């Protein structure tokens, strides 16, 4: 009998995950289906029971359930306990094991381009949901230091504490304090939602050049003002869809124990734009 997979969250109708995973199933002739399943914020427990009833084989978790879902897991992978959030779950006869593929998904496009992360100075804009996985990724790859710039300094300070706990030198500033300092960093990452509504770049790229890597995790629109401004300075740019694809590939491999058909998944993802 075919296996069923899902993505849960609210809102969920804009999710690109069903397209990406369905394309992978077609490419490899797997008897599987993937559905988007809306579970409102305060109905997670009932939603999970519903998934168990249909003998779900695995599911992705998105906003607003990534932290709350931790309570319902029977087992957790180390990526999950480190980041404190879950985005991929395997269900083995109703026994739920959680993983977090955001860190690997984030690092994947950097590795594909052979970008040297070790000893790099990083500027991270934003301290929200994805930021913790990004900090964990830079710690794992032995970045030299990370400056966390956020609208409110408190959230940035919390993330600095987390970074130091996992042996990554870190400091916090507000986004306004970035000023003309972008040129002092090897890698600059936007993990805020600025760009989703076509807003202009939150920082100046004065002095940035082709040696700088600029990465935006916002994936719609694909070409944010942040990336356009970086491109004008000849920086190496990484698109948000690449992280989305990286984490989907990792989730596929966890569920199926085989290499994911990267190109088929990429084509399906880009077709959704």
Curated annotation (Swiss-Prot):
Name of the featured protein: Shikimate dehydrogenase (NADP(+))
Pathway where this protein functions: Metabolic intermediate biosynthesis; chorismate biosynthesis; chorismate from D-erythrose 4-phosphate and phosphoenolpyruvate: step 4/7
Coiled coil location: none
Binding partners and assembly: Homodimer.
Positions with a binding annotation for shikimate: 15-17, 62, 87, 102, 219
Organism encoding this protein: Nitrosopumilus maritimus (strain SCM1)
Gene3D superfamilies according to UniProt: Leucine Dehydrogenase, chain A, domain 1 (3.40.50.10860), NAD(P)-binding Rossmann-like Domain (3.40.50.720)
Pfam family, one: Shikimate_dh_N
Positions that bind NADP(+): 78, 126-130, 150-155, 217, 240
Signal peptide from the UniProt entry: none
Broad EC category: oxidoreductase
PANTHER family from the UniProt entry: BIFUNCTIONAL 3-DEHYDROQUINATE DEHYDRATASE_SHIKIMATE DEHYDROGENASE, CHLOROPLASTIC, SHIKIMATE DEHYDROGENASE
UniProt family annotation: Belongs to the shikimate dehydrogenase family.
């Amino acid at each position: 009998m075919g296996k069923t997979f899902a993505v849960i969250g609210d809102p969920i109708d804009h999710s690109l995950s069903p397209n990406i995973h369905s394309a992978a199933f077609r490419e490899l002739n797997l008897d599987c289906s993937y559905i988007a399943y809306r579970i409102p914020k305060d109905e997670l427990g009932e939603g999970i029971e519903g998934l168990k009833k249909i003998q779900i084989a695995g599911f992705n978790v998105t906003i607003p359930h990534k932290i709350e879902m931790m309570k319902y897991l029977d087992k957790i992978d180390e990526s999950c306990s480190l980041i404190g959030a879950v985005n991929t779950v395997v269900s083995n006869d109703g026994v739920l094991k959680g993983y977090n593929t955001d860190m690997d998904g984030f690092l994947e496009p950097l590795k594909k381009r052979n970008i040297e992360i070790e000893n790099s100075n990083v500027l991270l804009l934003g301290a929200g949901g994805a930021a913790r996985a990004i900090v964990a990724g830079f710690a794992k790859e032995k970045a030299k230091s990370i400056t966390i710039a956020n609208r409110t300094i408190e959230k940035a300070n919390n993330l600095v504490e987390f970074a130091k706990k996992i042996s990554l030198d870190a400091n916090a500033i507000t986004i306004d304090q970035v000023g003309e300092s972008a040129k002092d960093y090897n890698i600059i990452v936007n993990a805020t939602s600025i760009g989703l509504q076509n807003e202009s770049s939150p920082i100046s790229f004065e002095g940035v050049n082709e040696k700088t890597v600029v990465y935006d995790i916002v994936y719609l629109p694909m070409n944010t003002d942040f990336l356009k401004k970086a491109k004008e300075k000849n920086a190496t740019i990484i698109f948000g869809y690449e992280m989305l694809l990286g984490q989907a590939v990792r989730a596929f491999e966890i569920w199926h124990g085989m290499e994911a058909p990267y190109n088929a998944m990429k084509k399906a993802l880009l077709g959704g734009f």
